[in-house]
């Protein structure tokens, strides 16, 4: 665990009718401003680890890049909180394209997206992957066992990428979207294909989280928490299996149940 992501702090804890003084661990919160082609693009408030993965994953999720080799230069000044990105095809980047809200359509039905780039980058999932109910629960258990920073602080979200057998990468962050972007960035940097992968997640499956999963291209999203109705509507259209409330020996399948077998 990167020591920069948490700090020790003396606190006064009230329990069973009395105060005691103790040392607790608290997560760090770090603002990182991303400069693309000399222009301020976004400030990400994040946990200060795996920052290159975070920036690359975020840019890919937003449709700024598709592959890591579209970046000509990349530098991070952690002391000042800046990441500098120069694109190979700089003339194709227009920051104004990333602030336009849009309602797109698919197969004759209205599909709601937040921004124009969501229409371009969300992928419809493939059908060739399926897992057993036991695997569903085992993958969630593996994510929880790997989540040391959460166990120490209780202040982060956890995300993991799996194949049909095992969990092979995990990332944590104070922002649930950041944890997903770190995974996306890692996969781009290491050229890991995503179309046959499964996303395991600690937080609520909101519409934004579902869109992140669709942009990765995963077919199954597994969470220990609840989904939202808008997220489930999107999952239906994008052919994504959503599994929520994975706790102990039970869970709920909300969409495209055919991928989860007994």
Swiss-Prot record:
Which positions form S-S bridges?
A: none
Query: Which is an annotated GO molecular function term of this record?
Result: sulfur carrier activity
The compartments listed are:
Cytoplasm
Please name the Gene3D superfamilies in this protein's record: 3.10.20.10, Cytidine Deaminase, domain 2
**Keyword check for Cytoplasm:** yes
Name the principal localization, coarsely classed.
cytoplasm
Offer one Pfam family short name for this entry: FdhD-NarQ
Key word Cytoplasm present in the record?
yes
Q: Where is the active site?
A: 107
Q: Name one GO cellular component term.
A: cytoplasm
**Alphabetically ordered keywords of this record:** Cytoplasm, Molybdenum cofactor biosynthesis
Q: Which GO terms describe its biological process?
A: Mo-molybdopterin cofactor biosynthetic process
Task: Return the similarity comment.
Answer: Belongs to the FdhD family.
Q: What does this protein do?
A: Required for formate dehydrogenase (FDH) activity. Acts as a sulfur carrier protein that transfers sulfur from IscS to the molybdenum cofactor prior to its insertion into FDH.
What is the protein named? Answer: Sulfur carrier protein FdhD
Q: Which species does the entry assign this protein to? A: Bacillus pumilus (strain SAFR-032)
């Amino acid at each position: 665990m990167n020591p920069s992501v948490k700090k020790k702090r003396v606190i006064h804890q009230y329990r069973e009718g009395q105060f005691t003084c103790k040392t607790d661990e608290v997560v760090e919160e770090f603002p990182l401003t991303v400069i693309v082609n000399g222009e301020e693009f976004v400030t990400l408030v994040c946990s200060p680890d795996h920052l290159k993965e975070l920036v690359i994953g975020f840019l890919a999720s937003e449709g700024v890049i598709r592959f890591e080799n579209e970046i000509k230069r990349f530098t991070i000044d952690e002391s000042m909180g800046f990441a500098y990105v120069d694109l190979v095809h700089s003339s194709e980047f227009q920051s104004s394209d990333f602030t336009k809200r849009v309602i797109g359509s698919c197969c004759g039905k209205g599909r709601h997206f937040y921004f124009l780039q969501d229409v371009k980058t969300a992928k419809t999932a493939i059908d060739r992957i399926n897992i057993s109910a036991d695997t569903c629960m085992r993958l969630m258990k593996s994510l929880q066992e790997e989540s040391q920073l959460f166990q120490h602080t209780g202040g982060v979200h956890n995300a993991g990428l799996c194949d049909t057998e095992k969990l092979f990468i995990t990332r944590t962050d104070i922002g649930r979207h950041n944890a997903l972007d770190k995974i996306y960035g890692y996969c781009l940097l290491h050229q890991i294909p995503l179309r046959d992968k499964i996303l395991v997640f600690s937080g609520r499956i909101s519409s934004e989280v579902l869109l992140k999963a669709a942009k990765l291209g995963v077919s199954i999203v597994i969470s220990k928490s609840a989904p939202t109705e808008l997220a489930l509507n999107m999952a239906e259209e994008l052919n994504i299996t959503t599994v929520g409330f994975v706790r102990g020996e039970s869970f709920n399948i909300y969409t495209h149940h055919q991928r989860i077998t007994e």
